[in-house]
Protein backbone atom coordinates (compact mmCIF):
# COMPACT_ATOMS: atom_id res chain seq x y z
CA UNK A 1 0.00 0.00 0.00
CA UNK A 2 1.06 3.60 -0.61
CA UNK A 3 1.50 6.07 2.26
CA UNK A 4 -1.93 7.59 1.56
CA UNK A 5 -3.68 4.19 1.58
CA UNK A 6 -4.83 2.50 4.78
CA UNK A 7 -6.72 -0.66 5.68
CA UNK A 8 -10.37 -0.43 6.78
CA UNK A 9 -11.43 -4.09 6.90
CA UNK A 10 -9.70 -7.42 6.39
CA UNK A 11 -11.19 -10.91 6.59
CA UNK A 12 -11.71 -14.29 4.97
CA UNK A 13 -14.68 -15.09 2.79
CA UNK A 14 -15.64 -15.93 -0.77
CA UNK A 15 -16.30 -14.01 -3.97
CA UNK A 16 -17.26 -14.44 -7.62
CA UNK A 17 -18.03 -12.41 -10.74
CA UNK A 18 -21.77 -12.60 -11.44
CA UNK A 19 -21.86 -10.20 -14.41
CA UNK A 20 -19.05 -9.50 -16.90
CA UNK A 21 -19.36 -6.72 -19.49
CA UNK A 22 -23.13 -6.80 -19.02
CA UNK A 23 -23.40 -10.59 -19.45
CA UNK A 24 -24.62 -12.87 -16.62
CA UNK A 25 -22.07 -15.55 -15.73
CA UNK A 26 -24.35 -18.56 -15.24
CA UNK A 27 -21.45 -20.96 -14.60
CA UNK A 28 -19.77 -18.75 -11.97
CA UNK A 29 -18.40 -20.51 -8.88
CA UNK A 30 -17.35 -19.11 -5.51
CA UNK A 31 -13.63 -18.66 -4.81
CA UNK A 32 -12.45 -18.67 -1.20
CA UNK A 33 -9.83 -16.22 -0.06
CA UNK A 34 -8.93 -12.99 1.68
CA UNK A 35 -11.06 -9.87 1.29
CA UNK A 36 -9.39 -6.57 2.10
CA UNK A 37 -10.95 -3.10 2.03
CA UNK A 38 -8.84 0.07 2.02
CA UNK A 39 -9.71 3.71 1.48
CA UNK A 40 -8.81 3.27 -2.21
CA UNK A 41 -9.78 -0.26 -3.29
CA UNK A 42 -11.15 -3.72 -2.55
CA UNK A 43 -8.63 -6.55 -2.85
CA UNK A 44 -9.88 -10.09 -3.52
CA UNK A 45 -7.02 -12.56 -3.04
CA UNK A 46 -7.60 -16.27 -3.78
CA UNK A 47 -5.76 -19.34 -5.02
CA UNK A 48 -6.00 -18.09 -8.61
CA UNK A 49 -4.44 -14.71 -7.90
CA UNK A 50 -5.38 -11.24 -6.72
CA UNK A 51 -8.00 -8.87 -8.09
CA UNK A 52 -8.23 -5.13 -7.37
CA UNK A 53 -11.52 -3.21 -7.47
CA UNK A 54 -10.79 0.56 -7.33
CA UNK A 55 -13.39 2.40 -5.24
CA UNK A 56 -13.44 5.13 -7.89
CA UNK A 57 -14.94 2.57 -10.30
CA UNK A 58 -17.69 1.33 -7.95
CA UNK A 59 -21.07 2.54 -9.23
CA UNK A 60 -23.12 1.22 -6.35
CA UNK A 61 -24.11 -1.77 -4.26
CA UNK A 62 -27.13 -3.46 -5.83
CA UNK A 63 -29.52 -6.24 -4.83
CA UNK A 64 -29.17 -9.98 -5.28
CA UNK A 65 -27.67 -11.50 -8.44
CA UNK A 66 -28.56 -15.19 -8.13
CA UNK A 67 -27.04 -16.27 -11.44
CA UNK A 68 -27.23 -19.95 -10.45
CA UNK A 69 -28.24 -22.24 -7.56
CA UNK A 70 -24.77 -22.09 -6.02
CA UNK A 71 -25.15 -18.34 -5.56
CA UNK A 72 -28.81 -18.54 -4.53
CA UNK A 73 -27.93 -20.82 -1.60
CA UNK A 74 -25.81 -18.08 0.00
CA UNK A 75 -28.11 -16.03 2.21
CA UNK A 76 -26.01 -12.91 2.58
CA UNK A 77 -23.61 -11.28 0.14
CA UNK A 78 -22.73 -7.81 -1.15
CA UNK A 79 -23.25 -7.06 -4.86
CA UNK A 80 -20.65 -4.57 -6.07
CA UNK A 81 -21.62 -2.91 -9.37
CA UNK A 82 -18.63 -1.59 -11.34
CA UNK A 83 -18.45 1.03 -14.11
CA UNK A 84 -17.56 -1.58 -16.76
CA UNK A 85 -20.99 -3.25 -16.43
CA UNK A 86 -19.57 -5.96 -14.20
CA UNK A 87 -20.89 -7.15 -10.83
CA UNK A 88 -18.76 -8.83 -8.15
CA UNK A 89 -20.34 -10.72 -5.26
CA UNK A 90 -18.58 -10.80 -1.89
CA UNK A 91 -19.58 -12.79 1.20
CA UNK A 92 -17.93 -12.79 4.62
CA UNK A 93 -20.51 -14.95 6.40
CA UNK A 94 -21.79 -13.32 9.60
CA UNK A 95 -19.53 -10.31 8.97
CA UNK A 96 -21.06 -9.45 5.59
CA UNK A 97 -23.34 -6.63 6.82
CA UNK A 98 -20.49 -5.05 8.79
CA UNK A 99 -18.28 -5.19 5.70
CA UNK A 100 -21.05 -3.61 3.60
CA UNK A 101 -21.42 -0.76 6.10
CA UNK A 102 -17.65 -0.14 6.09
CA UNK A 103 -17.64 -0.21 2.29
CA UNK A 104 -20.34 2.46 2.16
CA UNK A 105 -18.26 4.46 4.62
CA UNK A 106 -15.15 4.12 2.45
CA UNK A 107 -17.13 5.30 -0.57
CA UNK A 108 -19.00 8.18 1.08
CA UNK A 109 -17.33 9.37 4.32
CA UNK A 110 -16.24 13.02 4.30
CA UNK A 111 -17.68 13.54 0.82
CA UNK A 112 -18.58 17.20 0.33
CA UNK A 113 -21.93 17.89 -1.29
CA UNK A 114 -24.79 20.37 -1.12
CA UNK A 115 -27.76 19.69 1.13
CA UNK A 116 -31.16 21.34 1.49
CA UNK A 117 -32.75 20.52 4.85
CA UNK A 118 -35.61 20.40 5.24
CA UNK A 119 -36.65 20.85 1.62
CA UNK A 120 -40.16 19.66 2.47
CA UNK A 121 -41.65 19.52 5.97
CA UNK A 122 -44.99 17.90 6.75
CA UNK A 123 -45.80 17.90 3.03
CA UNK A 124 -45.10 21.65 2.68
CA UNK A 125 -42.20 22.99 0.57
CA UNK A 126 -39.85 25.20 2.61
CA UNK A 127 -37.72 28.18 1.57
CA UNK A 128 -34.47 26.63 2.82
CA UNK A 129 -31.44 26.94 0.54
CA UNK A 130 -28.78 24.41 -0.46
CA UNK A 131 -25.71 24.53 1.81
CA UNK A 132 -22.33 22.83 1.71
CA UNK A 133 -22.13 19.74 3.91
CA UNK A 134 -20.11 16.60 4.60
CA UNK A 135 -21.53 13.14 5.24
CA UNK A 136 -20.53 10.10 7.28
CA UNK A 137 -22.02 6.58 7.24
CA UNK A 138 -22.23 4.01 10.01
CA UNK A 139 -24.34 0.87 10.44
CA UNK A 140 -27.44 2.74 11.63
CA UNK A 141 -27.37 6.30 10.29
CA UNK A 142 -26.20 8.83 7.75
CA UNK A 143 -24.76 11.84 9.57
CA UNK A 144 -24.72 15.20 7.79
CA UNK A 145 -22.52 18.06 9.04
CA UNK A 146 -23.80 21.34 7.58
CA UNK A 147 -21.48 24.29 6.90
CA UNK A 148 -23.59 26.47 9.24
CA UNK A 149 -22.58 24.25 12.18
CA UNK A 150 -25.80 22.24 12.43
CA UNK A 151 -26.08 18.46 12.15
CA UNK A 152 -28.73 16.31 10.46
CA UNK A 153 -29.11 12.64 11.38
CA UNK A 154 -30.89 10.34 8.92
CA UNK A 155 -31.56 7.00 10.61
CA UNK A 156 -31.26 4.37 7.89
CA UNK A 157 -34.21 2.27 9.07
CA UNK A 158 -36.33 5.45 9.07
CA UNK A 159 -35.93 6.23 5.35
CA UNK A 160 -39.34 6.13 3.66
CA UNK A 161 -38.21 6.86 0.10
CA UNK A 162 -35.18 7.95 -1.91
CA UNK A 163 -35.97 9.46 -5.31
CA UNK A 164 -33.37 10.49 -7.89
CA UNK A 165 -33.98 13.74 -9.77
CA UNK A 166 -32.17 16.47 -11.69
CA UNK A 167 -32.60 20.00 -10.29
CA UNK A 168 -31.04 23.43 -10.61
CA UNK A 169 -28.74 24.04 -7.66
CA UNK A 170 -27.15 27.48 -7.31
CA UNK A 171 -27.33 28.03 -11.07
CA UNK A 172 -26.14 24.57 -12.16
CA UNK A 173 -28.18 21.47 -13.00
CA UNK A 174 -27.10 18.59 -10.76
CA UNK A 175 -28.20 15.07 -9.80
CA UNK A 176 -30.30 15.37 -6.63
CA UNK A 177 -31.49 12.64 -4.28
CA UNK A 178 -34.78 13.44 -2.49
CA UNK A 179 -34.81 11.50 0.78
CA UNK A 180 -37.93 11.19 2.95
CA UNK A 181 -37.36 10.54 6.66
CA UNK A 182 -38.38 12.07 10.00
CA UNK A 183 -36.94 14.52 12.48
CA UNK A 184 -36.85 12.96 15.97
CA UNK A 185 -39.07 10.14 14.65
CA UNK A 186 -41.91 12.65 14.57
CA UNK A 187 -42.27 15.15 11.70
CA UNK A 188 -41.96 13.86 8.13
CA UNK A 189 -39.39 15.80 6.08
CA UNK A 190 -37.55 15.53 2.79
CA UNK A 191 -33.85 16.31 2.63
CA UNK A 192 -32.28 16.99 -0.77
CA UNK A 193 -28.69 15.87 -1.50
CA UNK A 194 -27.02 17.44 -4.57
CA UNK A 195 -23.72 16.00 -5.76
CA UNK A 196 -21.91 14.44 -8.72
CA UNK A 197 -23.43 11.45 -10.53
CA UNK A 198 -20.97 8.92 -9.03
CA UNK A 199 -21.66 9.90 -5.41
CA UNK A 200 -25.40 10.22 -6.12
CA UNK A 201 -25.48 6.66 -7.46
CA UNK A 202 -23.79 5.21 -4.37
CA UNK A 203 -25.90 7.27 -1.96
CA UNK A 204 -29.03 6.15 -3.81
CA UNK A 205 -27.92 2.50 -3.44
CA UNK A 206 -27.60 2.94 0.33
CA UNK A 207 -30.86 4.78 0.94
CA UNK A 208 -33.01 2.93 -1.61
CA UNK A 209 -31.99 -0.37 0.00
CA UNK A 210 -33.32 0.85 3.33
CA UNK A 211 -36.46 2.42 1.86
CA UNK A 212 -37.44 -0.81 0.09
CA UNK A 213 -37.69 -2.56 3.45
CA UNK A 214 -40.66 -0.36 4.37
CA UNK A 215 -42.58 -0.90 1.13
CA UNK A 216 -45.69 -3.05 1.04
CA UNK A 217 -49.37 -2.43 0.47
CA UNK A 218 -51.88 -2.30 3.33
CA UNK A 219 -55.65 -2.05 2.87
CA UNK A 220 -56.91 0.94 4.88
CA UNK A 221 -60.31 2.58 5.24
CA UNK A 222 -60.85 6.22 4.26
CA UNK A 223 -61.07 7.16 7.96
CA UNK A 224 -57.77 5.43 8.70
CA UNK A 225 -56.18 7.31 5.79
CA UNK A 226 -57.52 10.62 7.19
CA UNK A 227 -55.85 9.85 10.51
CA UNK A 228 -52.57 9.07 8.75
CA UNK A 229 -52.71 12.24 6.65
CA UNK A 230 -53.26 14.32 9.79
CA UNK A 231 -50.29 12.71 11.53
CA UNK A 232 -48.19 13.12 8.38
CA UNK A 233 -49.01 16.84 8.32
CA UNK A 234 -47.70 17.28 11.87
CA UNK A 235 -50.86 17.00 13.99
CA UNK A 236 -50.09 15.46 17.40
CA UNK A 237 -51.66 12.06 18.10
CA UNK A 238 -53.34 13.64 21.16
CA UNK A 239 -54.96 16.31 18.95
CA UNK A 240 -56.37 13.91 16.33
CA UNK A 241 -59.89 13.57 17.88
CA UNK A 242 -60.48 17.35 17.96
CA UNK A 243 -58.72 17.97 14.64
CA UNK A 244 -60.85 15.42 12.77
CA UNK A 245 -64.00 15.75 14.88
CA UNK A 246 -63.87 12.10 15.92
CA UNK A 247 -64.66 10.25 19.13
CA UNK A 248 -61.61 9.51 21.30
CA UNK A 249 -62.45 5.80 21.54
CA UNK A 250 -62.75 5.56 17.74
CA UNK A 251 -59.33 7.16 17.30
CA UNK A 252 -57.85 4.80 19.92
CA UNK A 253 -59.30 1.85 18.00
CA UNK A 254 -57.77 3.11 14.74
CA UNK A 255 -54.40 3.54 16.45
CA UNK A 256 -54.60 -0.08 17.65
CA UNK A 257 -55.34 -1.30 14.13
CA UNK A 258 -52.53 0.77 12.54
CA UNK A 259 -50.04 -0.47 15.13
CA UNK A 260 -51.04 -4.07 14.34
CA UNK A 261 -50.36 -3.61 10.60
CA UNK A 262 -46.95 -1.99 11.29
CA UNK A 263 -47.94 1.50 10.12
CA UNK A 264 -47.65 3.22 13.52
CA UNK A 265 -45.56 2.50 16.57
CA UNK A 266 -46.55 3.20 20.17
CA UNK A 267 -44.41 5.72 22.01
CA UNK A 268 -46.08 5.75 25.43
CA UNK A 269 -48.94 3.87 27.04
CA UNK A 270 -51.00 7.07 27.02
CA UNK A 271 -51.48 6.11 23.39
CA UNK A 272 -49.01 8.52 21.91
CA UNK A 273 -48.01 7.21 18.51
CA UNK A 274 -45.58 8.15 15.80
CA UNK A 275 -45.57 7.21 12.13
CA UNK A 276 -43.39 4.44 10.75
CA UNK A 277 -41.93 4.62 7.26
CA UNK A 278 -44.74 2.49 5.79
CA UNK A 279 -47.33 4.85 7.31
CA UNK A 280 -45.62 7.92 5.87
CA UNK A 281 -45.56 6.33 2.42
CA UNK A 282 -49.29 5.54 2.60
CA UNK A 283 -50.13 9.02 3.90
CA UNK A 284 -48.09 10.69 1.18
CA UNK A 285 -49.85 8.65 -1.51
CA UNK A 286 -53.26 9.45 0.00
CA UNK A 287 -52.49 13.19 0.05
CA UNK A 288 -51.38 13.07 -3.59
CA UNK A 289 -54.69 11.41 -4.49
CA UNK A 290 -56.73 14.20 -2.85
Swiss-Prot record:
Any one GO biological process: chemotaxis
Subunit field text: Interacts with chemotaxis (Che) proteins as well as flagella accessory (Fla) proteins.
Designated gene of the protein: cheF1
Organism: Halobacterium salinarum (strain ATCC 29341 / DSM 671 / R1)
Keyword vocabulary terms for this entry: Chemotaxis
Disruption phenotype: Mutants are unable to switch the direction of flagellar rotation. Flagella rotate only clockwise, resulting in exclusively forward swimming cells that are unable to respond to tactic signals.
The protein's role, per its UniProt record: Involved in taxis signal transduction. Essential for the ability to control the direction of flagellar rotation. May have a role between CheY and the flagellum.
Domain of life, per lineage: Archaea
Protein name: Taxis protein CheF1
Amino acid sequence: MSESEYKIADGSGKFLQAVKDGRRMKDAQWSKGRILLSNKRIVLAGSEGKRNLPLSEVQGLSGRHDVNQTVAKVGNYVSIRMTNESVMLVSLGDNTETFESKLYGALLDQTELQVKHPAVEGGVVTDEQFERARIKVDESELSVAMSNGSFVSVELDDVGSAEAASLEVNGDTKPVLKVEHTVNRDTSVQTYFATDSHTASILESLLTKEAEKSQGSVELSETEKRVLMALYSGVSSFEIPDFLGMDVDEVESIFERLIEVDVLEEVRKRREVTMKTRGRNIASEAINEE
